[in-house]
Amino acid sequence: MRGLDYRWIEALDSVVSKGSFERAAEQLFISQSAVSQRIKQLEKYLAQPVLIREQPPRPTLVGKKLLGLYRRVCLIEQELVPELTNQEHVRPVSMSIATNADSLATWLLPALDKVMKSRQVELNLVIYGESRTLDKLKNGEVVGAISLEPQPITGCSAEYLGQMEYLCVASPEFYQKYFAKGVTPRSLIKAPAVSYDQYDELHNKFLWDYFAVLRDKVINHTVGSSEAFVRLALSGAAYCLIPRLQIISELESGALINMTPDFMLSYPIFWHHWQLETGVLLEISDAITAYAKSVLPQ
């Protein structure tokens, strides 16, 4: 019986990553019909579909598992072949990491700095909410993810990194305008706030846990940028929850004030990654774990 042909999965990967059969054909230097034929052969071999044929095409659950397998094999190949053939000039190892915006804006880039400077590596940092990054790892789209989930998924490891601490802050002028009589449920309902996106549960949790206020009762801007949170707070346009690490100088200078010194939101984060014990991924895992533990409260 003929085994699984990785050219079939390569075609699937190209269609999904490029978003169409046409662009996949251009990437693989074959005809569009050849791409389609390879995917049909893969589906015939597995006796089930691997691709949802819509625009853009999406992998089925089985397709996602195959892509995860294929990308692991590609990563191992990228590191092993140059070593076996003594190649001096090789293409950089390419890998994707899923991270929340706040980790990227505070500690993640310094953690990766040494590896990025010393190794031939191309990193694709995919930004998602910390409650959803693990889905990218489950689907095989990334090699590692910063997540709230402590339990590793099958074939992966998880390391505790530390606590992300959030402060509720605003400019002095904003505070005087909306909270001169204190931070209360009534004043919070009147004051504009900021959330990252519709999946951002951080602000919802803060409002409900400490003040029993529901999100739909407040004025809430949506801005998909951690840096924009700081700028909005500094400008006096809104108050928001921001990582303590991101605003140390602003707090020290008085440009921002901690609105609720008695309340601080804190949650643990974890680094999930494929179980590869050598190579660049191991270096990245060691760098992320060591740096995070040096700057995040444990």
From Swiss-Prot:
Gene3D superfamilies: 3.40.190.290, Winged helix-like DNA-binding domain superfamily/Winged helix DNA-binding domain (1.10.10.10). One of its GO terms (molecular function) is DNA binding. Residues 4-60 form the HTH lysR-type domain. Keywords: DNA-binding, Transcription, Transcription regulation. Controls the transcription of genes involved in arginine and lysine metabolism. Belongs to the LysR transcriptional regulatory family. Homodimer. HAMAP family: HTH_type_ArgP. This is HTH-type transcriptional regulator ArgP. It comes from Vibrio cholerae serotype O1 (strain ATCC 39541 / Classical Ogawa 395 / O395). The gene is argP.
